[in-house]
Amino acid sequence: MEIFDKKGRLLFPDTERHRKMAAEKGILAQGKKILISQVFCSNGHPLVRPENPKFDQEPGIHLICEGNTFWQSVFLSPFQGDRQKQHKTDFKMGEILQIYCPECHVHFPKFAPHDCLPEAMYLALFLDQEANYYNTVCICNVWGCYSSFLRLAGEIFSEVRAQKSAR
């Protein structure tokens, strides 16, 4: 995205245009909360369905999480930054999980490393059915991680860049 026009003048963002583009991708503002209303696996299967358990009257994001000893359905809050989830049994704190689509069982692709554990990764969940990495939200694959909530891909790029420059 350009920040200057051809004559060198600063371009100001068209916030209404950005809001419309975000809404098309299922990102909606609800007061001070940001709702992610649609998420897909890399094969285009929807993870948010009306029958999913609700968080503040909005359906959660359905994932299958597999640890060392068992697997289960986990429903994440669809609100960015909200750590709530619904599940039957806790995994061991700090356990690395395999996370995949409940419909086709494809694993979510690795997006970027995370610093909570040496082998921790952010996994990409897509905001469109085309599996475009520019339109993703991410989750950490470590159970109980302090960042185990939805993060926008742009935030993760900034975080990784800051970590590398601090080294």
Q: What is each model feature region?
A:
Residues M1-S37, K54-W71, L76-F91, L152-R167:
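Short, intrinsically disordered terminal segments enriched in charged and Pro/Gly residues
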Residues K20-G26, Q84-Q86, P118-N132:
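A cross-kingdom feature marking solvent-exposed beta-strand/loop segments within repeated
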Residues K32-I36, M93-I96, V106-F111, N132-N135, ...:
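Flanking scaffold residues of small Cys/His-coordinated metal-binding clusters
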Residues Q38-N43, C101-C104, H114-C116, C140:
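Short cysteine-rich clusters marking metal-coordination/redox-active sites
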Residues D56-W71, Q98-C104, Y133-S147:
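Cysteine-rich micro-motifs
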Residues E130-R167:
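Short, Lys/Arg-rich amphipathic alpha-helical interaction segments
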